[in-house]
A protein has these predicted regions:
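Active-site nucleophile-adjacent alpha helix/oxyanion-hole segment immediately C-terminal to the catalytic cysteine
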Residues: 81, 95-96, 101-113, 117-324, ...
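A generic structural signal for solvent-exposed, polar alpha-helical segments
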Residues: 10, 222-225, 254, 357, ...
Length: 476
């Protein structure tokens, strides 16, 4: 297993540089053990210089519109919309009103590319006027939702500390039904989370806010409401080629769902029962660079989806049938989560060839093809979540991380620079990596099926899941 870690950054001559990998942090894990197909010289991987820089403004994510089928609206057409708009503005300060006005002028506020065709405006209005879950504040949730949609780079995975006045209640909640003294002591220690394992969930949250703002607003509204859950109707063919295999996946991940036909299913997503404790604390005690209450609810929900409903927000740990590690999500779980959240046929494309000792020995395709896959997806309006690795001097994978590629630019020599977002760097801006640095480090990328199926023989997510489950059952 690869142990994922965050990076320590420092400022040198005004440019943010990577100093070292923090080996103390168990941040995220995925299964990198695959059969060796071909040997490729990878000696240059470990010798690359690490020189990421930061963009000064929000990058253009693609050359193609993200929602080409929707007509962009920038004018409030009805009395209802005007009333919703006025009501929202009345609950914001001057800066907040300016941001909402800009969302209207850019077509984001009236975007309706959500599962129920509600607009960003509709859902912000509900947040502002309808009750929130106990302990949550409407104005805080409204402000945080607007901010995340307007500038998703502020989304972070950094846990907040538990203030003394909450400590006893949180420990009691975490130790519920425990009788063993050692377990009780450990439970009291586990609630003090120093390093987050939610990079997949935070990257999913970022992508949802950036790529589907209306759906993000709908999730924010529903998850912070008294019911603390959101329904989503998906196409079963986006999970598997056959309906029964899609149903198997939903059951395997323990997702509550209803089916009325062989084509679609209505799923129910919810944060874990302890997420509300974290969300309440962040409502009143949020420090700079920590998660907002909205981040808590979103990331808990996505962790629940991927971990077979086994996540605990108090400890940032999970159980579940597919992962023996108690932190983060493995690649298969990540792909399932992204597929149901975005209702798309997402494939996790593994690019690195790794032997049974977690040694990077080659690639499944050449780096040029990898670059083509990424730039094609970006040109189609996709934000691409990738897992990249760090190796030691013997090319043994020791660390890695999950980030999102949001765009790219090409210089006059044809060299590509990828524009990325990292939810764990405490820097609310995009970061840039050259293709020479990033491409050799990419272990996997979540890409639409049609982009890669002609170049690589990809095992579908449901097939991988069934095989993995059979292997684990056989070993039990």
């Amino acid at each position: 297993m690869a142990i994922f870690s965050d990076f320590n950054f420092y400022n040198r001559c005004g440019v943010i540089m990577v100093e070292q990998v923090n080996f103390r942090t168990r941040q995220y894990n995925y299964n990198t053990i695959n059969s060796v197909k071909s040997a490729v010289n990878t000696s240059y991987v470990k010798n690359l210089s690490v020189t990421p820089t930061f963009t000064a403004s929000v990058p253009i994510t693609s050359k193609a519109p993200q929602v080409a089928s929707l007509k962009m609206r920038t004018t409030l057409d009805s009395k209802e919309e005007k009333n919703e708009y006025t009501t929202i503005l009345s609950q914001l300060d001057k800066n907040g009103r300016k941001i909402v006005d800009n969302l209207l002028k850019t077509g984001v506020l009236l975007n309706s590319d959500s599962n129920d065709h509600s607009t960003v405006l509709d859902n912000l209005y509900k947040i502002a006027t309808e009750p929130r879950a106990e302990g949550l504040d409407s104005k805080t949730m409204l402000k945080d939702t607007i901010a995340a949609i307007a500038y998703p780079y502020i989304i972070t995975q950094q846990f907040g500390d538990i203030p003394p006045e909450y400590q006893q209640r949180v420990v009691a909640a975490n130790n519920e039904n425990k009788t063993n003294l050692i377990d009780i002591w450990q439970g009291s220690q586990d609630v003090n989370v120093e390093h987050s394992g939610t990079c997949v969930a935070a990257s999913t949250e970022f992508k949802l806010a950036k790529q589907l703002p209306a759906e993000f607003a709908r999730f924010a509204q529903e998850l912070s409401s008294p019911k603390l859950s959101v329904n989503k109707t998906i196409g079963l063919n986006n999970l598997a080629d056959e309906t029964l295999n899609a149903i198997w996946l939903l059951n395997a991940f323990e997702i509550p769902f209803e089916t009325n036909n062989f084509n679609t299913a209505k799923l129910n997503f919810a944060p874990d029962k302890n997420a509300i404790f974290r969300a309440k604390i962040q409502t009143t005690n949020k420090d700079p660079y920590e998660r907002t209450p909205l981040d808590v609810l979103m990331q808990s929900t996505f962790m629940q989806i991927g971990s077979q409903q086994s996540y605990n927000s108090l400890t940032d740990k999970r159980a579940g049938k597919f992962n023996q590690n108690d932190k983060g999500l493995i690649e298969f779980e990540k792909t399932f989560t992204e597929s149901v959240v975005f209702d798309k046929n997402i494939l996790s494309v593994t690019y690195q060839t790794v032997d049974e000792n977690a040694r990077l020995v080659g690639y499944e395709t050449d780096l040029g093809t990898m670059k083509k896959h990424l730039t094609t997806a970006l040109d189609e309006g996709e934000n691409v979540i990738i897992g990249y690795t760090q190796t030691d001097n013997n090319n043994i994978i020791v660390n890695g991380h999950e980030i999102t590629i949001v765009g790219y630019k090409t210089d006059d020599k044809g060299k590509v620079t990828f524009i990325c977002n990292d939810t764990d760097d405490n820097i609310p801006r995009a970061i840039e990596y050259s293709e020479d640095y990033l491409l050799p480090k990419i272990h996997h990328a979540a890409l639409p099926k049609h982009i890669v199926e002609g170049d690589l023989n990809i095992v579908p997510n449901w097939t991988e899941g069934i095989d993995m489950y059979k292997q684990m059952k056989g070993a039990a």
